[in-house]
Structures are given as structure tokens and as C-alpha cells.
Regions:
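Charged, gly/pro-rich active-site loop segments
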Residues: 1-19, 96-172
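A generic structural motif
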Residues: 53-54, 108
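Short glycine-rich loop/turn motifs
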Residues: 34-36, 48-51
Length: 172
């Protein structure tokens, strides 16, 4: 007979590391500092760019907005695998987030994500007149997180079940 986990027993090391990594990711990707988004084009070439308008408030989903005409939108539609990188100001804590991204132009989701984003001041594309909708939502469902402390050559990971159940996504 399988016994249920003892709530008084301390979590195992992997669980503690996963909790630590998730907490750091939430702090570093909180929308107050930019992150780097990497996508892959149709030729298999990587492309990276700074993204400064984002939210991790609907864990484990990371939201950002972009121009619907941007190359990253086309990259994600062809290959949804993306990677994000965040760091603290001293660059001694690095968080890498990997997952699958989706593009949404749904009006309801756009309104909900707009409300989640605290700082839109660096969404420069919003000041450029376009035909159609002014932005698209990039929703990344987080599948894996690495936390690296380069000064000490230490690496922690969280993935799969460690991240919690996938969120339903806004407006779904």
C-alpha cells in the first residue's frame, strides 16, 4: 500500500530547487525589467530581441505584446518553440525560460492582457500607425526554467510538473 506524503516532512532537494527557481523567475520576469526573447526563423536561424512589456501574473503563462506585423510573429507561427532570458541588475542571476508560444489577435484576450501589463512605455510600436489591430499578444506557456548563478557555476532547474498545472490562458 502506497502511503501519502507526510505534510510535516521537508520537501526533497529537487522540489526545493524547483520552488526556488520558480520564485526567482517570477521576480525577474515581473514586468519591471526587460527580457530577451529568442525565436527561430524559417531557415532555422535564431533571432533575439529585447522585450520590455510583459507580465507573468497568470503563471505559468508569460504574456507580452508586439506589432502584429513583426518578424517574431511570423517566426512563432512557423515554430512555436521560444526561449526567454532574464537577469537581475548585477547579472549574477540568470533565468532562462523555454516554452511554446502562441499569437493571439482575439479582442477579449487582448483586453485582458492589456490590463495585466503594468508598464507599456517601452512598447514603441504602439506609436506607429498601422492598419488593423495595434498589437498582438504573445502567450508563452512555460515548460522549463533554468536558473544560473554564473559566479558560482551553479545551475538549478524546474520543468514539467514542477511548474504547476498549465493555466487555461486568458479568455479561454
Amino acid at each position: 500500500m502506497k502511503s501519502s506524503p507526510d505534510p510535516l516532512k521537508p520537501p526533497n532537494e529537487a522540489a526545493k530547487h524547483a520552488e526556488f527557481v520558480i520564485d526567482l523567475a517570477k521576480k525577474l520576469a515581473d514586468g519591471t525589467r526587460p527580457g530577451v526573447l529568442a525565436t527561430v526563423d524559417e531557415h532555422g536561424m535564431p533571432h533575439v530581441r529585447w522585450m520590455a512589456t510583459l507580465s507573468l501574473r497568470d503563471w505559468p503563462l508569460l504574456y507580452t505584446i508586439t506589432s502584429p506585423a513583426s518578424r517574431k510573429v511570423q517566426h512563432i507561427r512557423r515554430n512555436p518553440g521560444v526561449s526567454w532570458m532574464f537577469s537581475n541588475d548585477e547579472l549574477n542571476i540568470i533565468i532562462n525560460i523555454r516554452g511554446k508560444a502562441r499569437i493571439s489577435n482575439d479582442a477579449g484576450k487582448m483586453q485582458q492582457v492589456w490590463k495585466l501589463l503594468e508598464d507599456k512605455s517601452k512598447a514603441y510600436f504602439l506609436s506607429i500607425a498601422t492598419d488593423g489591430r495595434g498589437f498582438a499578444v504573445i502567450e508563452t506557456e512555460i515548460e522549463e526554467i533554468d536558473c544560473i548563478l554564473p559566479k558560482y557555476d551553479i545551475k538549478f532547474q524546474a520543468h514539467g510538473a514542477d511548474l504547476g498545472s498549465p493555466a487555461r490562458g486568458l479568455g479561454e
